[in-house]
Regions:
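Short charge-dense sequence patches
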Residues: 3-11, 21-26, 40-47, 115, ...
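A glycine-centered beta-loop-beta connector
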Residues: 30-33, 38-54, 96, 104-120
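A signal for specific C-terminal beta-sheet/loop modules enriched in small/flexible residues
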Residues: 34, 65-66, 101, 112, ...
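The conserved cystathionine-beta-synthase
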Residues: 16-34, 41, 83-100, 107, ...
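Tandem CBS (Bateman) regulatory domains
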Residues: 1-13, 52-97, 119-152
Length: 152
């Protein structure tokens, strides 16, 4: 089976927001584009964070923050895993599985966002990547490891 580069599998049309964008506007962009996350980039388009639907729910809505005045920099995930478009998809799959992350910003050598790789992208290309590899990756991403906290 041919080795596939991340650039062949990733989504290339990526929306992004700046750290000072308010949470409400970021959520609207995500909703309008049917996406579950959005990279947060500085003026040079370098990734400084990622905002997920989960971040909005747990760090803004559940904390009763005013979304129209709360900048995404206050609720975004700052420890962002990224991958390079020239690397093999298997490298990104390992990163996603080991860290249980569903979406990975794809950045060039200058850390500028050029795409995003999602579980959906992997599923769309499963025949080229290897169906069993994709299934294993998704299973590992979704497998809850460790103890869970009872919120009730």
């Amino acid at each position: 089976m041919k080795k596939m580069k991340i650039s062949e599998c990733m989504s290339k049309d990526v929306c992004f927001v700046k750290p000072d964008c308010n949470t409400y506007d970021a959520a609207r962009i995500m909703c309008e584009n049917h996406i579950g996350c959005i990279p947060v980039c500085d003026e040079q388009k370098s990734v400084v964070g990622i905002l997920t639907d989960r971040d909005i729910l747990l760090r803004a809505v559940a904390c009763n923050k005013e979304t129209k005045t709360t900048p995404v920099s206050e609720i975004m995930t700052t420890n962002v895993y990224t991958c390079n478009p020239e690397k093999e998809v298997t490298e990104a799959q390992n990163l996603m599985a080991q860290n249980q992350i569903r979406r990975v910003p794809v950045v060039d050598n200058a850390n500028k966002v050029v795409g995003i790789l999602t579980m959906g992208d992997l599923a769309k290309h499963d025949k080229k990547i290897g169906q069993q590899n994709v299934c294993t990756t998704i299973e590992n991403i979704c497998n809850c490891q460790g103890s869970t906290k009872n919120c009730g």
